UniProtKB/Swiss-Prot annotation:
Keywords, comma-separated and alphabetical: Hydrolase, Lipid A biosynthesis, Lipid biosynthesis, Lipid metabolism, Metal-binding, Zinc
GO molecular function terms attached to this record: metal ion binding; UDP-3-O-acyl-N-acetylglucosamine deacetylase activity
Catalytic reaction(s) noted: a UDP-3-O-[(3R)-3-hydroxyacyl]-N-acetyl-alpha-D-glucosamine + H2O = a UDP-3-O-[(3R)-3-hydroxyacyl]-alpha-D-glucosamine + acetate
Membership in a protein family: Belongs to the LpxC family.
Cofactor(s) needed for function: Zn(2+)
Pathway: Glycolipid biosynthesis; lipid IV(A) biosynthesis; lipid IV(A) from (3R)-3-hydroxytetradecanoyl-[acyl-carrier-protein] and UDP-N-acetyl-alpha-D-glucosamine: step 2/6
Documented EC number(s): 3.5.1.108
A single GO cellular-component term on record: membrane
Gene3D superfamilies: lpxc deacetylase, domain 1 (3.30.230.20), lpxc deacetylase, domain 2 (3.30.1700.10)
UniProt: Zn(2+) binding residues: 78, 237, 241
Organism: Ectopseudomonas mendocina (strain ymp) (Pseudomonas mendocina)
Name of the featured protein: UDP-3-O-acyl-N-acetylglucosamine deacetylase
GO biological process: lipid A biosynthetic process
Length: 303
């Protein structure tokens, strides 16, 4: 049986919010079967919980924000991408502020934290959402699509008319049956344009952003001294973001996501459209792991 997974131990980290610039204390904790990923604002009294589900998404400007009434948690996508990539079904994410810390701008530090905590298999089958037919949403020239696929695959294309992007790969397709999320996707960092940063800061966004936690591009070049981690790091980061956004289905996916210039808003619209079209998907479990089109790394012993 492919089982649900949680963390073996509690683990903590500290960072700053990309948009708020605030110091944030993050604690990841194990959670019981069928809990899902639940964010908890421990700085509030009483503590407010928000489940990581598509229907709880509020703002999608520059990041994905979960809301419960007037309480929010910003920038959840990189942590959720790490949870998805490592197959974590159930966890509590405790935060001392309204935003998940940006760390280095990728999912890599969250992968390290989760692997350091160790993974624990649980006594219940893991539930997958299997795509049965194509579902597409369009906004202008942007497009996001689910299609049936016996596994999990994410294809993405970006289209930036800019010197830095013209010479680099702007499309990628990652089939996770043959490609490691940890090695090939998790370290891709978020990116931004120098020309946009002043405007964003005037809107109280990107207050914590720097070359320490993002790829920064001016009119001609990448400003980070160390350059890029992957030749196709820009589009790989969009794949990383999409994996985090897709995990707001509440379950791992069997199917392919295709994005063309898609972002957090369109990704969320695709999830909501899929959920409404109940003939387009089914929930499945696998009693025999050998029959599953998706496999996960064996649980890692806590470091």
């Amino acid at each position: 049986m492919i089982r649900q997974r949680t963390l073996k131990n509690i683990i903590r980290a500290t960072g700053v919010g990309l948009h708020s610039g605030e110091k944030v204390y993050l604690t990841l904790k194990p959670a019981p079967v069928d809990t899902g990923i639940v964010f908890r604002r421990t700085d509030l009294d009483p503590i407010v919980e928000i489940r990581a589900l598509a229907g709880n998404v509020g703002e999608t400007t520059m990041s994905t924000t979960l809301v419960n009434g007037d309480v929010k948690v910003d920038t959840v996508e990189h942590l959720l991408s790490a949870m998805a990539g490592l197959g974590i079904d159930n966890a509590y994410v405790e935060l001392s502020a309204s935003e998940v810390p940006i760390m280095d701008g990728s999912a890599g530090p969250f992968v390290f934290l989760i692997q350091s905590a160790g993974l624990q298999e649980q006594e219940a089958p893991k539930k997958f959402i299997r795509i049965l037919r194509e579902v597409t949403v369009v906004e202008g020239d942007k497009r996001a699509t689910f299609v049936p696929f016996d596994g999990f695959k994410v294809s993405f294309e970006i289209d930036f008319d800019h010197p830095v992007f013209r010479n680099r790969t702007q499309s990628a397709s990652v089939d996770f049956s043959s490609t490691s999320f940890v090695k090939e996707v998790s370290r891709a960092r978020t990116f931004g344009f120098m020309r946009d940063i002043e405007f964003l800061r005037s809107q109280n966004l990107a207050l914590g952003g720097s070359v320490e936690n993002a790829i920064v591009v001016d009119e001609y070049r990448v400003l980070n001294e160390d350059g890029l981690r992957y030749e196709d790091e820009f589009v790989k980061h969009k794949i990383l973001d999409a994996i985090g956004d897709l995990y707001l289905l509440g379950n791992s996916l069997i199917g392919e996501f295709k994005g063309f210039k898609s972002g957090h808003a369109l990704n969320n619209r695709l999830l909501r459209t899929l959920i409404e079209q109940t003939d387009a998907w089914e929930m499945v479990t696998f009693e025999d792991a050998k029959l599953a089109p998706i496999s996960y790394m064996r649980p890692v012993a806590a470091v």
